[in-house]
Amino acid sequence: MNKYKPVPKLSSQSPVHHTNLRIPPSGRPFKKEDFLNLISKDSLESDSESLPQEAKSWSDIKDQIQDKDMEPDSLEEDSPSETEEAVNRKAAHNTNREDLSAHDAGVNHSQHQVEDKYSDLRYDPNWKNKREEGQPLAGEALPGSADSSSENLPLAPLYPSREPSMGLSAGKGKEKKSPQSEASLLGSEFLSPKYERSTRQNGFFSELSDSDQEEKSSGLSQYLKSSSSHNDVFLPGSRGPRRRKSKQYFVEKNKLTLGLPMPKTDSYLQLHNKKRGETRLEQISYPVRDTDKMTVQNDKEVENTFMDPEDKWHQRAKQLKNYQEHLSQYEDTKSGNVPRGQSSDAANGQQPSRRTAKARVRKQRKHQKGLKSLGTKELVVSQNNQNNPFQQPQNQRQTADASAKHELAAQTNASNPNLQDARTLTHNPKVTSDSFVSPKQALDRALYKNSISGLNANKRRGHRREEERILYQPQPIYVFSDTHLQDFNELPHRHESPSQRAPQSDHHMNTHRSTKTKKPAKQPQAETKYKNIEMLWKFHSSSDMEPASASPDSRLAQIMEQHQQALMQLAEVQPSEGSLASIILPPILSRVESESQLNSERSHRHQVKMARSNSEGYLLQLERGKRHRKRSSTKSSKLKGYQKRDVKLGGLGPDFASVRDKMQMLMQQKEYAQQVKDYNMKALSILSKPQTSKTESKSAISRKKALDYAKTIPKPKPPNLPDQTAKKTKNSRHSEKEGGLPEISLLEILQSRHEREKQAVAAFKVLHIV
């Protein structure tokens, strides 16, 4: 099993594509000095292959380096800013291929070797033993690299500026490079204890011409700019000897890889991302004009590398706090230049502070919220204002003009970010008057512009909000006059310096026109505010009949005067009855007359708006008339009476009071129904009795008459029969009567039996049997 030494991990997307790196065979270990020789040799050669071949070979080399790397925490994602820098540097590096294409063709053929692309994807059963044996090797190799890097760190700053690269390219053209100069170019991340021996073996630096050295030194400086931001993470010596991690760390790391939820908040990846963001922010915000300041800041950064992470974090927090204070002071001075009825000495730069402490605290909180979205331009302005207090008013005027230009550029070209960046670079005096701009650094300027394009967009958005807040603040209605409007329109020309008037006259005309178009935008709101008022409609109709050639300032002044007159007349016409004090409406008849007049004058669009508002007013008038009628009829129909009605609201649960009231109402209804039923029954009985008496009287009268009539009728006489027949009938009747009676003997038998049974029953009763 092979034992490898730890190799410093490079950024995954480097600006220089190493297509000619020789990959060592798997038989011998992968040493750091071989890798340095390959890097130095390849960085001074140009690419002769096409871009797809470069990308393929670089991906193979990156896979091989990741396979040899022994650091466990190499799972990181590349930021989109690194990919943009890689693309830009690739385009810059392609310009140097034409000079060295012939030399590179011969070397390429001999350096390509067949390798296994998928070696890192195959399963290795001895992965645990490899890791355990690789960790002591990493611990042994740390002290030497830390010492060498600490010795050579003061020679190469962490953030190399453009001036040292220019000086190296111009001054050391014909001389052989010393190890110190090479260390300053390569940076502290490529230093090792055997670096001098590798530089002696590599004699390719001395064979190059002056132009080749010039171009390659600038290319190396560009490369080191991107890689220097990762020094704190990838350098073992920058943070002292690395501690040996326990097995529990790797268990948690594997859990994180498998996607299990981890409660750990301060993981290595999060800390590294925070540190990388801080170094990226510092790298963007560090270009200052004076070279002395640059060297001092670089020395401070070198000192910061030996500090503890906590002390470093506290120092960064202090710097951020100072930056917030400078930014708040700069915003206060910038907002003081805005014309709000101020005097002439305030317009000339002497700004009396009339704000209260509460307003200042509110503004500071607002700036602290939007602090991360601001770019480096405001930082440079605030630093210059602090260092040069005599030039502060002029800088404030320049930043005010620049904010207006940023707003105009963002409104006209929101779909083209490259054009926006070009306009900000051409219009902004801070960028165009840079002291260290040179033709050699045009590509660096483009890269710097791309890196802060997002910040510039956020800053333009902040400037636009500031301008809108200033322009759309509620103006005092009765104090606004024509002179103030004229001063407000002429103030950008007043703040403009004489050196800037000539190239920026066209731009100020555009901003002046945009502010003019923004001012009448308050008119529709004023119209909707007084829609239901008759007098104001008359004034608006007269203002609409004005010719279109009138300027917006005069129209605004006339509208203000008309509003004042309308309010004066409304104070006289306001009704005194006033059931509701907030409703101010004229009589309905005059409203209809004004509607008929306005229909003949206004356009169809205004007719629709007016009809809608008139319908709303008509409904209000109907309600008002109903209330007046109620007031005339009853005393209780007042506003207080209406407010006191139906005030009680039901709760969420059952309302026992309402249930009890309903039950009482039902009982009362039943009682009333029963009373009604009884009353109806009584009424029916009383009415039926006279009817029966009448019928009985009628029947009795008829019966009486019939009986009286029957008494008067004589009885018929029986016929005279012979005597024999009469005797026969008498004898037959007597015989029938005698045959029907029972015999006497039978009757006696039954009677005696009855007596015996009576005695037996009496005996049973005596014996208590029955």
UniProtKB/Swiss-Prot annotation:
Residues 218-229, 383-398 have a biased composition (Low complexity). GO terms for cellular component: extracellular region. Residues 57-71, 112-134, 295-314, 493-509 have a biased composition (Basic and acidic residues). Residues 340-354, 410-438 have a biased composition (Polar residues). Residues 355-370, 510-521, 625-642 have a biased composition (Basic residues). The keyword Calcium does not apply. InterPro entries: JHY. Residues 1-249, 295-438, 493-527, 595-647, 708-740 are annotated as: Disordered. Residues 72-85 have a biased composition (Acidic residues). Keywords: Cilium biogenesis/degradation. It comes from the Eukaryota. Expressed in the brain, specifically in hypothalamus, pineal gland, and ependymal cells of the aqueduct of Sylvius, as well as in the choroid plexus of the third ventricle. Expressed in the ependymal cells lining the lateral ventricles (at protein level). One of its GO terms (biological process) is motile cilium assembly. PANTHER family: JHY PROTEIN HOMOLOG (PTHR14726:SF1). Required for the normal development of cilia in brain ependymal cells lining the ventricular surfaces. This is Jhy protein. The gene is Jhy.
